[in-house]
Amino acid sequence: MINLSVGEPDFHTPDHIKEAAKKAIDENFTFYTPVAGYMTLRKAIAAKMKNENGLDFAPEQIVVSGGAKQSLCNVILATINPGDEVVIPTPAWVSYVEMVKLAEGKTVTVPAGVEQDFKITPEQLEAAITPRTRMLLLCSPSNPTGSVYTHDELKALADVLAKYPDILVLS
């Protein structure tokens, strides 16, 4: 059995990262950061996104967090009210369901099997939507399967969602 539930590294922290952490402690660089992250870091991220990914973001558009898990949870907690439904294609990352539970929402899972490359269809999405649906949580590439929705597949899902303007998409 191969456990695909969490992405725990199978390697030790690289020495240069350890040294940078030790240096930060030695230089008393240990206080709370600005909410969006240090501007120098946000500028470096903006430069990286432009140079390596061809994406143009202003540093003011970038928020640094403790990781994707924190950011996803923040969005869910800020937008999901008790009883709201969140549609989640499965298989899915183990933390999604727990985040929705924390917000007192209800998870609506939509099975996506190997025969459809672990991707939901527009028909499945439409069938999962109710008056209580508040969000579609869609991950592409999928965690844990690695499946990637094509442009046409995303467009077909977007066509369904266009009929429901109050449904948020968290991706």
Where in the sequence are the language-model features?
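N-terminal small-domain helix-loop-helix segment of the aminotransferase-like
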Residues: 1-67, 74
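Short beta->alpha connector loops at strand-helix junctions that form conserved
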Residues: 90, 109-113
